[in-house]
Swiss-Prot record:
GO molecular function terms attached to this record: imidazoleglycerol-phosphate dehydratase activity
The keyword Cytoplasm is assigned to this record: yes
HAMAP family for this protein: HisB (MF_00076)
Gene name tied to this protein: hisB
NCBIfam families in the record: PRK00951.2-1, PRK00951.2-4, PRK00951.2-5
Name listed for the protein in its UniProt record: Imidazoleglycerol-phosphate dehydratase
Membership in a protein family: Belongs to the imidazoleglycerol-phosphate dehydratase family.
EC number(s) from the headed UniProt entry: 4.2.1.19
CDD domains: IGPD
């Protein structure tokens, strides 16, 4: 059974079409009108081995906030839908990723209880036209709609591009681990019997 989802979300601010295949090969087709986010989603798919297609249009003439946040929302929704009842998944995942001088870690629990711990202090700067404070908005939207507990920690690093890239790669690798099916797991990985 394919663990996939196709989501379309239309608001007055954004129009987003997204398809996700959890058991993919890391192939991506990304067009969000936000070049830096395209880059991050491309490497997210690659390092998580998810097949991901995103087409998004938003009110970027105002700024990128709505588009970035809403893509996080739709990606989280797609993961939740693709995982279904979560039977057989490992549930937990973690990754520590270096990117030159940067070291970032992500630990996640696909518990159904959304919570973001974001220990990534970034200067209020732009990478190209991208406000780096939107990284937090992306992950907040993701966890809220995926039902994931996500702890994102920057241990050290200076280059803002490297920091954000390490965070996205670590998130992808942790989610790949958490979504893996394990034949030893009967039902769900919870003493409650439900996630």
């Amino acid at each position: 059974m394919a663990r996939s989802a196709a989501i379309e979300r239309i608001t007055k601010e954004t129009q987003i079409k997204l398809s996700l295949e959890i058991d993919g090969k890391g192939e991506a087709q990304i067009c969000t009108s936000v070049p830096f986010l395209d880059h991050m989603l491309d490497l997210f798919a690659r390092h998580g081995l998810f097949d991901l297609k995103v087409e998004a249009h938003g009110d970027i003439d105002i700024d990128f906030h709505h588009t970035v946040e809403d893509i996080g929302i739709v990606l989280g929704t797609a993961f939740k839908e693709a995982l279904g009842d979560k039977c057989g998944i490992r549930r937990y995942g973690n990754a520590v990723v270096p990117m030159d001088e940067v070291l970032a870690s992500v630990a996640t629990d696909l518990s159904g209880r959304p919570y973001l711990v974001y220990n990534v202090e970034l200067p209020k700067v732009k990478i190209g036209d991208f406000d780096v404070e939107l990284v937090r908005e992306f992950f907040q939207g993701f966890v809220n709609h995926c039902g994931a507990n996500l702890h994102l920690n920057l241990m050290y690093g200076d280059n803002v591009h490297h920091i954000v890239e390490a965070c996205f790669k670590a998130a992808a690798r942790a989610l790949d681990q958490a979504t893996q099916l394990d034949a030893r797991i009967e039902g769900v990985m919870s003493t409650k019997g439900k996630l």
